[in-house]
């Protein structure tokens, strides 16, 4: 039995675990990336030859996925592959000067079969400017990812000169990406002000050439540039003197609405700011762009508090927003209960966060709202209360005269319904009026209806219909109309004949 068991066991093959060589794995990944880049070059050439933008746009959609796979060796291969002709030696050497090995990359066989392969577009002396700009853009993105910002600014400046000196329509989709990374490279070196004149010139050119996506991108970059240096007046003038293209993408619209919301909030136009920020959230991607959504919700919560409204609690409990909005949740709690002490404590503890979020100025304006909320609460609880007691309950550190002026302003704004007795030194509350007997519910429903109608109209504008979808129905209606017209003419002729016979 033992011999039988051993013989059966010996028949079972022993499979050795396959050891994966890291260098070989890196080689295979680089070869696949190189093949993808060659395919993208072919698509760009096809888009240029057929004047079809969709091929170039499909290549740009793959930028984020390819961006993660880029490395020094792959970019060297694709630059040598695309600029193989001697006529492009200057451009080739310029790009290769940025692709210096840092010693951390694994060695990859540079004489692979992939490099030996050529295509007609690469072997010929002619190279489309779109392909040249695409490869240049990949090198720029790689430099930014490697945090080589000084090299990135030089690379982006040369790329901008190439784009501005060409007027080809097929370069428009690439130009919007180039504008963005050009501004980003200078922002990383804290020299964002240097690109302002270049972007203004590019905006004029894009407007004259009807480059809608490029125009939308540049407007957003200029708004970001102005707001970075707190130049709100210049940003407002830019909004007044430019028209944002309606054919821009949803992402560009989301950024545009956010910048408008920030500008209106600084200008004390909180209702307009709330409208723009709400539209920005609606236009932004729902499953991605978490950082953008957090930024918008931070500003939106402050604007709602400045409007006298309290943000919904479930906004602060969302998984993506819970940690980022925690300081703003403490502010909301302080404003809601009208506790000036809690507000000062939250402001002191989170002042650095508010400054980094660029909301510190708006948060400081909430002090009067906290006092108003506290006064509203006291006005509901007491029919009559002295000014000294109001200062004590609100933890107000000013004088009685100061609180008297604040109460007068609160009554004038319609926050509370009360009267001030200066001789007795107290606040006299009036009877509470039922809100449903006023016009407030009507205005609230009207605002909601307007929002729903706007969403409906935007959805209709965003829908696409096949041009031949209703062709059959149109032809059928035309035939019916033609038949009716012929029948009416025939009846008219018969009636005229009958009249002629009767006269005879």
Curated annotation (Swiss-Prot):
Keywords: Proteasome. Residues 254-434 form the PCI domain. One of its GO terms (biological process) is regulation of protein catabolic process. Pfam families: PCI (PF01399), Rpn3_C (PF08375). The keyword Transferase does not apply. Residues 485-504 are annotated as: Disordered. GO terms for cellular component: proteasome complex; proteasome regulatory particle, lid subcomplex. GO terms for molecular function: enzyme regulator activity. Gene3D superfamilies: Tetratricopeptide repeat domain (1.25.40.10). Residues 494-504 have a biased composition (Acidic residues). Belongs to the proteasome subunit S3 family. Acts as a regulatory subunit of the 26 proteasome which is involved in the ATP-dependent degradation of ubiquitinated proteins. The 26S proteasome is composed of a core protease, known as the 20S proteasome, capped at one or both ends by the 19S regulatory complex (RC). The RC is composed of at least 18 different subunits in two subcomplexes, the base and the lid, which form the portions proximal and distal to the 20S proteolytic core, respectively. This is 26S proteasome non-ATPase regulatory subunit 3.
């Amino acid at each position: 039995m033992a011999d039988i068991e051993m013989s059966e066991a010996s028949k079972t093959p022993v499979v050795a675990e396959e050891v994966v060589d890291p260098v070989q794995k890196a080689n295979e990944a680089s070869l696949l990336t190189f093949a993808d880049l060659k395919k993208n070059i072919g698509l760009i050439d096809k888009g240029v030859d057929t004047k079809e933008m969709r091929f170039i746009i499909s290549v740009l959609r793959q930028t984020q996925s390819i961006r993660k796979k880029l490395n020094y060796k792959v970019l060297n291969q694709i630059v040598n592959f695309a600029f193989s002709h001697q006529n492009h030696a200057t451009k080739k050497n310029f790009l290769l000067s940025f692709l210096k090995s840092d010693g951390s990359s694994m060695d990859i066989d540079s004489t692979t079969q992939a490099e030996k392969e050529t295509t007609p577009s690469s072997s010929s002396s002619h190279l489309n400017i779109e392909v040249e700009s695409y490869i240049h853009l990949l090198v720029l993105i790689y430099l930014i990812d490697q945090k080589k910002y000084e090299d990135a600014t030089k690379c982006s400046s040369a790329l901008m000169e190439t784009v501005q000196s060409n007027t080809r329509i097929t370069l428009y989709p690439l130009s919007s990406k180039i504008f963005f990374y050009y501004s980003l490279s200078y922002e990383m070196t804290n020299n964002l002000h240097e690109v302002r004149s270049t972007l203004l010139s590019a905006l004029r050119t894009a407007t004259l050439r009807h480059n809608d996506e490029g125009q939308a991108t540049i407007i957003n970059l200029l708004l970001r540039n102005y707001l970075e240096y707190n130049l709100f007046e210049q940003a407002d003038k830019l909004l007044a003197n430019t028209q944002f293209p309606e054919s821009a993408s949803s992402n560009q619209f989301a950024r545009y609405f956010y910048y408008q919301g920030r500008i209106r909030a600084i200008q004390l136009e909180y209702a307009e700011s709330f409208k723009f920020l709400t539209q920005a959230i609606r236009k932004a991607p729902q499953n991605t762009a978490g950082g953008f959504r957090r930024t918008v919700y931070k500003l939106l919560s402050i604007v709602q508090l400045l409007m006298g409204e309290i943000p919904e609690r479930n906004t602060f409990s969302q998984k993506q927003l819970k940690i980022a909005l925690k300081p703003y949740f403490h502010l909301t709690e302080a404003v809601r209960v009208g506790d000036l002490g809690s507000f000062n404590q939250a402001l002191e503890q989170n002042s650095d966060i508010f400054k980094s979020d660029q909301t510190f100025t708006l948060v400081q304006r909430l002090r009067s709202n906290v006092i108003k909320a506290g006064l509203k609460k006291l006005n509901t609880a007491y029919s009559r209360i002295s000014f000294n007691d109001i200062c004590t309950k609100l933890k107000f550190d000013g004088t009685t005269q100061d609180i008297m002026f604040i109460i007068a302003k609160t009554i004038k704004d319609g926050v509370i319904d009360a009267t001030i007795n200066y001789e007795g030194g107290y606040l006299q509350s009036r009877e509470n009026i039922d809100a449903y007997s006023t016009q407030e519910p009507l205005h609230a429903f009207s605002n909601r209806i307007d929002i729903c109608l706007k969403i409906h109209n935007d959805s209709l504008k965003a829908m696409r219909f096949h041009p031949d979808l209703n062709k059959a129905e149109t032809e059928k209606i035309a035939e019916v109309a033609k038949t009716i017209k012929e029948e009416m003419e025939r009846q008219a002729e018969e009636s005229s004949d009958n009249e002629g016979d009767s006269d005879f």
